[in-house]
Structure formats: C-alpha cells, structure tokens
Amino acid sequence: MRRSVMMAVVAAVSLAAAAQAADLTADEIVAKANDAAYYAGNNGRATVSMSLSDGRSRDFVILRKDVQGGLDQKFYVYFKAPADVRKMSYLVHKRPGKDDDRWLFLPALNLVKRIAPGDKRTSFVGSDFLYEDVSGRGLDEDTHELAETTETQYVVNNTPKNPASVEFAYYRVWIDKDTFLPSKAEYLDKNGKLYRRVSSEKIQTIQGHPTPTEQKAEDVARGTSTTITFSEIKYDIGLKDRIFTERFLRRPPREVTQ
C-alpha cells in the first residue's frame, strides 16, 4: 500500500512538472535558457583554449561577475597565447535593455579601443565566434516564437526587432528541457539559407551547474569553424568589482595571470 501511495505521489509530481513545462511561453523559455547559459553562480572563472580550423589557436582566461540586484554583468578576458595576442584584454559591461560597453586593449599599440555597439556582431579575435557570443544577446532584441517541442527540447525562432542592426533574418535555438541550456543555434539569412551555426558539444555539471565545456561555431558559408574548450571552471570565487574596470585592461589582475 505504501509503495502504491509513493508511486502515485511520484506520478503526480512528474505530471505537474510536465504540465508546468508545457505552460511555458517562448519568452519564458528563452529567459530560462539565458539564465542557464550566462548566470550560473554569482561570478566565475574559466581557462579557455580556442582552436580555429585554419590551424591557429588562442588561449585566454575569462572572468564573469553579476551585478547585484539585476541582470547586468561584467566580463573580463585576458589572452595568454600566442604571441600576437598575448597580454591583450577585453572588457564588457553588459546592460540588458541598453547598449553594452566594450573595450579592447591592444598591447602592441598600448591602446584601449572602445568597441562600437554596431561591431558586437563582428569576429572575436579572428575566430568564427562573435563579440556578442562572449556575453550573450539581449532578450529584448528579438521576438521569440516557440516553433516546435520535442520529447527533449524546445525549438525557438528568434526574429530581430531591428533587422538593420544584424546580418541574420532570424535564428533558431534548440533548448534542452531539463537543463535549459541551448544545445544549438542556427542563423538564417533573408533568403532562408543557413549560414552560421553555434553548438554545445560537451556539457558537465560543475558545482551543481550544468556547464558547456566545449562549444563550436561554424561559418557554413565560408566552410570555417572554431572550437573552444573550457577548463578549470570555478563558480562563486568572490571576484572584486575593481577587476572589471578600464584600469585593469593594461594591468591584468592576478586572477587571470596566475
């Protein structure tokens, strides 16, 4: 009898969870996906190895800190290798609903360059990833529509509200129902032709957070690709606000140099 009651309770909970998932709107699904992909923990650090299909590589460290009380975030990227990008650093102040502030320090010129909002969808250090991929795209920049629901994933179409500001007509994202992590995004041009794809190749649970540890960006039109591998991932390490300032572009903190 007890077993029957327990089975009934488990079944009821499962049905309730399924019903709750079925009731999610496209906007809610995308918001959960954004939270899973960019807001794990209050802050974090990772070592990143980037491999381009032409044989080039990039090694860097990325730091992230959430601004308390909202969705604003700060990102700091410090390049360690190869020689042509060593000591280069990149800073983002992400402000959903507004243009992000982005700076790039070029050590060869001893120059801090402000990256214009219109350049956020350009190549990130010569790779197939874009500057916007580092910190994410604003939820309010697109209209979201649930195109399909499978047994394991939501498929959402995202259409830009300002088409003139981007190179795509729309993009489609596959989102895992359990983790809400995006597994794949495909970008289509005005002719409906696929020209770009970004996918999560490997996912591990780190400190309780499902985390992509390998991602791939493909320029389908040009036939090139870039793979990034994340290691030494740590969350909630007490990063200080002072790190995420223009001053530390020229003077990298020990959190990225060690």
Q: For each of these PLM feature ranges, what is it?
A:
Residues 15-23:
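Sec/Tat signal peptide C-region and signal peptidase I cleavage site
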Residues 7-16:
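Bacterial N-terminal signal peptides
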Residues 30-32, 46, 60-62, 140-145, ...:
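Short structured motifs
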Residues 1-4:
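Positively charged n-region of N-terminal signal peptides that target proteins for export
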Residues 245-258:
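Short, low-complexity, Pro/Ser/Thr/Gly-rich segments in the mature regions of secreted, periplasmic
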Residues 49, 56-63, 67-69, 94-96, ...:
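Ribonuclease/tRNase effector modules and their secretory precursors
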Residues 24-108:
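N-terminal mature ectodomain segment of secretory-pathway/periplasmic proteins
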Residues 80, 91, 101-105, 111-117, ...:
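Gly/Pro-enriched, hydrophobic low-complexity segments
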